Structures are given as C-alpha cells and as structure tokens.
C-alpha cells in the first residue's frame, strides 16, 4: 500500500531592516512553542529555513534554541534548509556572489547546528535554469519551489528532477491552502489529502503502480501562529498515528527512499505572491524578475545599481580585506525585498548599503573622480556615470535628467522616484508647456509630459578630462508643431553641477511658452509611522521665505506661485544634506509634496521643486538659462554641555 508523506515547512523572509525586537517577537510566537511541541512529539517531522540574520540572532540571543535543534536533527525529526545568506533574488547575481551567499549560509548552519544543509530554499522562489550549476557546486541535492512556479501537468505530488549542462538537481513542489479552520481541523485535513491523492491517481501512473507521494506544505506566519496557539498540530499528530497511509516526513528522508522522479525543465520563474509593487497592477504578464523590472522603473534602477556595484567589487584587486568588507555590504544590499516592494524604506536601505560598499573601495586612496559613458541599465542607450568625491550620479540620455543621485555622507538615493506614467521623475527634468498645460501642472494634475522630459537627447560633446557633457534634443511644440531645439550642458564638479540650457526657436513663428525645470528630491529616510519633511527656503534679493513642505506652495500662498526667486534650498536635516539651486536669472517657483500609496498606506514621498520662466523667442533666436546646483553638508547643532 502506497503512503502519502506530509512535510510541513516554515520559510520566513528577511530584510536589512529587521530589528532584534522583531526577531525576538517571532521567536516567542513561533519558534519557542514549535520547538517545545516537536521535542514532546518525536514522530512529528518539521522543516525549517532560516535566513542568515535568524541564525546570527539565535547564536547571540537564543543559543538554547540551537541546542534544541541539534537534538531534533540527531533523531531525524527536523531538517534545516540552506539558501542565500541575505535572501537576494539569486538569478540577478554574478556567479561569485551566488556561490558566496550560498556557501556563507551553509557554513553558518553547519557551525551552529553541526550539519550542512542538503536542501535549498530561494527567496520569492526566484528561479533561473543557470542556478542548477551553482546549487550543485555548493553541495545542494534538492530545492523547494512554489507549486505556482511549476507546470501544472507536473504537479503529481512526486519529486521532480531538472538537469542543465550535465548537472541535475531535484525539485520538491511546495503547496498552500491544504487546511481549513473547521471544528474537525485534523479530520478534514486528512480527508482533503486523501481526495487530492485519489484525483491524482486517476490520471494514471508513469512508472509503477501506487508510488509513495509527498506533499510539502508551506506555512505562513499567521497560519503557523494560529495552529500553535490552538494546538492543532497536536490533533494532527494523533490522526497521523492512527492513519497508516499518511505520515509526516522530511524532504531529505523521502529523497533517499523514493525511486520515482519526474523530469522537468523550468527556464525562469518567480512567486507572484511576493510582488508588492502596485495594488492595481496585473501580475498575469509577470512570470520572471526580468519581466518585473521592465514593468517597474524603480526596480530596474535598483537592479542596475546592484549590478554596477557588484562589478566594482568583483574587479577590485588591491586589498583583499577591503574587498571582503565591501562584498559583505554588497551582499546585504542585494536583499530581495528592496526589489519586490514599493516601500521606499526598503529600497533606500539597499541603496545605502550599496553606496557603503562603493565607499569602502574608494577609501584606498586610489580613487579618482570620473565621468564615463556606457549602457548602465541595459536599455540599449548610453547613460553618463558621474563618480565624484562626494556623490554618485547617473544622467540618462532619454530626458537628459539625473535618474540616480547617491550621496556618500548620507548614502541614500535622492533620485529614487516612482514613475510619473508619461516620463521618468528625476532631477533637472525639462518641460516646455503651453499656458493651459502649465495650469494643470502646477496644480498637480495631468499635464502631458512637457515634450523634452521623454525625448532622447543626442550627445554633442563629452569630455572625461574636463567632466563636461553636452546634450541636444529637437521636439515639436504646441498644436502648430513648432520646431524647438534644446541644448543642455553639464559642468560636473565635486560638490554639484552647473547646468546650462539654450532653447532655440527653429520654426518660422514666434515661440511663446513656459520653460520649466523640475527636480524631484526623494525622502531617503521616509517612515510612514512618523512622517517628517525636508526644510525648504527660497531667497528673493535680501528676503528669505520659509515654506511649509507638508503642503503645496499654491495651497499656502493663496494659489499663487513665487516670483523673482534668486535661490532655492531644500534641506534634509536628518541626513545632514542640503541642495541649493541658483538660477542665473530670477525665476518663478512652485513646490508640492508627492506621495505614493499601497493598500491605503503611504510608501513613498518625493518633494517636487520646479523653477520656470515665461519665454518669448523670435524665429531663429535662442535664450539661455543656467542653474548652479550645489550639494552641501549641514552643520549639526551641538547640544550645550550640562555643567
């Protein structure tokens, strides 16, 4: 008689923002009661997966739990899975980083509980066929993948096997929703299992009649807390002891005794339940991370940054100890939650760690400021990378704006903005509006894209030695399709940039328009539980105005924008950074805060700061505007000494 084996699995996720308090709370609600139950029920099997931060926490704060795990492992009741130490999306990493993170967690598990893992779990079940080689090289024999990532015809409650380039690894599908909280929880669970098996057996057998089958059940935290608090595992244990055809087991034990494996080939996949980018997004078209990054601009930007810093670290040769320190920061910054969540705090933490990795490499006294040109984000168009003493910036050819701005002191990306829909938000986004369009724009309403914000700029001049870049673009403006040309010049230095605009009317009619330069400064330390705002000051002649950044300028100035502005200063007092914009000619000015929500919660905040001029240009003529952009460190206020 064939037996159906049940393997219960708990696979928590980790992020770089996990605190000791959060891990302690999880221990008290999950691991402590579960450990007690398993110790008193030796016939009940359970499989754990611990990200790297969990293992480190137990070693420091709860060594008694690791001692208990050792005893449970010795009697073949518990198995601990391996994986990547910092829960990255594995297919995105270079081979050195893949193997390094896998080996790091395996070594930590072996040192902590005395046994090297043979099974593997990947964050978000993010899979690529090339991972077979990495997993086998690192000593893994099988991997768990969510059933939604596997072709339905292969889901027969049997282990699968996949080969790639001469190496093979077994795959155990992981299932959900096998239980309902009814009065007869245990009996209903057993009945549901039996019905599932009968349904599968009606399909016919592949190799032999009545093979043993395994159902790996993934328990999420709320369900596991409920099961433990109501002692539902105890009821299940009694049913399993009375039921001869259904038992609990471990994937490793089943692997040794099972002879049937179905062949499968999975090119790339991802567990869609981890995607938290947009509550209105249709995830049916997203079947891999590569499709995800094409759908969400913020994901692609962070992914490009991860690849770039990974390249810097892996190519560094001077100091092995420095390289290892930088690599540790790189691995922490590769955490997958920053890529799969709309939360700006998780993304900013990844940018922070990546900038710290680059900063470690820069401190070897061989760093030189540079301006380089290459395809940074793999879109087929060159970007311009500015590695200055105090910051890192990426200037995009499409739109000619700054799409990434990482400050070394603050180590966060101030250009981390969510897409506007029609154009990419960043710093020095160029618009040319009609009166009606600008009326909508200043009120935060849809106002088209201002033409130049989405136009590809062509390179006019590129000087690495002088850190100079000139871009040019041609567009058609208004209903009459007037031909206008905009030349944009960047002079890049250690503390900022000088940006020069030359707007030329190439049509045969006078050009009357509004030239607007929009800069979106992201909140790098945004906390939805305690929302804070940047400080904003404007100067006109000798008069200084302090603006309340919690609401738009129009709302607090009787629906009027500011005129004759000489300079604008937006300050992140918490990060100790200020940004100053000084036009060569007095400008008009509007400001408003922009927030993004997910499930009715604010997850991102940007401060939209726009300088604009009314322009009137005769045919064949041009005008010039220049903005001096400066990044400065704020002096921290010293508290008086108490004597």
Where are these regions (language model features)?
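Active-site and substrate-binding clefts of carbohydrate-active enzymes
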Residues: 2-32, 39-41, 158-169, 176, ...
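Short, well-structured secondary-structure segments
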Residues: 3-94, 100-101, 118-122, 141-147, ...
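Acidic-aromatic substrate-binding/catalytic surfaces of carbohydrate-active enzymes
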Residues: 24-25, 96, 100, 389-463, ...
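CE4/NodB-like, metal-dependent polysaccharide N-deacetylase domain
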Residues: 97-124, 192-217
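Catalytic domains of cell-wall/extracellular-matrix polysaccharide-remodeling enzymes
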Residues: 100-157, 222-236
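Beta-strand-rich recognition/accessory modules
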Residues: 370-375, 463-482, 496-498, 562-643
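Acidic (Asp/Glu-rich), glycine- and aromatic
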Residues: 406-407, 484, 492-539, 634-643
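Active-site/ligand-binding surface loops and adjacent short beta/alpha elements
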Residues: 510-514, 520-591
């Amino acid at each position: 008689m064939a037996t159906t084996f049940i393997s219960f699995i708990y696979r928590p996720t980790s992020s770089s923002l996990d605190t000791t308090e959060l891990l302690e709370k999880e221990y008290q609600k999950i691991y402590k009661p579960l450990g007690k139950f398993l110790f008193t029920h030796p016939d009940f099997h359970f499989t754990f997966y611990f990200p790297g931060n969990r293992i480190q926490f137990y070693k420091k704060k709860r060594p008694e739990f690791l001692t208990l795990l050792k005893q449970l492992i010795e009697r073949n009741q518990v198995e601990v899975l391996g994986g990547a130490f910092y829960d990255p999306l594995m297919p995105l990493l270079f081979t050195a980083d893949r193997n390094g993170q896998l080996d790091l967690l395996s070594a930590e598990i072996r040192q902590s509980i005395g046994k090297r893992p043979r099974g593997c779990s990947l964050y978000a079940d993010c899979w690529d066929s090339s991972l077979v080689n990495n997993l086998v090289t690192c000593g893994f024999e099988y991997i768990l993948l969510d059933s939604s990532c596997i072709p339905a015809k292969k889901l027969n409650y049997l282990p699968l096997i996949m080969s790639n380039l001469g190496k093979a690894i077994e795959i155990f599908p992981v299932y959900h929703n096998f239980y309902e909280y009814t009065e007869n929880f245990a009996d209903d669970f057993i009945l549901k299992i039996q019905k599932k098996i009968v349904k599968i057996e009606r399909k016919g057998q592949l190799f032999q009649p009545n093979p043993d089958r395994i159902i790996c059940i993934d328990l999420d935290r709320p369900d596991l807390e409920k099961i433990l608090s109501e002692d539902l595992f105890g009821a299940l244990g009694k049913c399993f002891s009375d039921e001869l055809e259904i038992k609990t087991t471990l994937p490793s034990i089943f692997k040794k005794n099972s002879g049937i494996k179905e062949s499968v080939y999975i090119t790339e996949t991802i567990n869609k339940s981890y995607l938290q980018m947009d509550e209105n997004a249709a995830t049916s078209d997203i079947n891999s991370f590569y499709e995800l990054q094409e759908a969400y601009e913020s994901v692609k930007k962070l992914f490009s940054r991860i690849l770039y810093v990974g390249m810097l670290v892996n190519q560094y040769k001077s100091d092995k100890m420095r390289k290892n320190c930088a690599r540790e920061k790189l691995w922490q910054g590769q955490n997958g939650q920053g890529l799969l969540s709309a939360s700006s705090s998780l993304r900013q933490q990844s940018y922070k760690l990546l900038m710290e990795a680059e900063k470690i490499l820069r401190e070897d006294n061989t760093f030189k400021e540079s301006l380089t040109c290459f395809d940074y984000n793999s879109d087929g168009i060159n970007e311009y990378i500015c590695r200055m003493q105090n910051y890192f910036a990426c200037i995009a050819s499409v739109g000619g704006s700054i799409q990434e701005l990482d400050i070394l002191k603050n180590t966060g990306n101030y250009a981390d903005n969510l897409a506007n829909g029609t154009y990419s938000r960043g710093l020095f986004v160029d618009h040319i509006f009609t009166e009606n369009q600008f009326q909508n724009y200043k009120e935060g309403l849809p106002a088209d894209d201002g033409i130049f914000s989405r136009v590809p700029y062509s390179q006019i001049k590129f000087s690495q030695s002088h850190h100079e870049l000139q871009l040019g673009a041609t567009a058609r403006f208004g209903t009459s399709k007037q031909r206008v040309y905009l030349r944009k010049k960047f002079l890049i230095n250690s503390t900022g940039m000088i940006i020069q605009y030359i707007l030329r009317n190439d049509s045969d009619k006078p050009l009357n328009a509004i030239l607007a330069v929009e800069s979106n400064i992201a909140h790098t330390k945004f906390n939805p539980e305690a929302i804070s705002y940047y400080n904003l000051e404007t100067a006109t002649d000798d008069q200084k105005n302090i603006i309340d950044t919690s609401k738009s300028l129009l709302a607090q100035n009787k629906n009027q924008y500011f005129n004759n502005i000489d300079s604008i200063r937006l300050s992140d007092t918490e990060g100790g950074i200020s940004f100053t914009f000084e036009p060569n000619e007095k400008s008009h000015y509007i400001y408003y805060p922009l927030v993004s929500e997910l499930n009715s919660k604010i997850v991102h905040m940007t401060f939209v700061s726009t300088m604009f001029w009314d322009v009137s240009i005769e045919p064949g003529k041009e005008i010039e505007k220049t903005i001096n952009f400066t990044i400065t460190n704020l002096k921290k206020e010293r508290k008086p000494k108490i004597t």
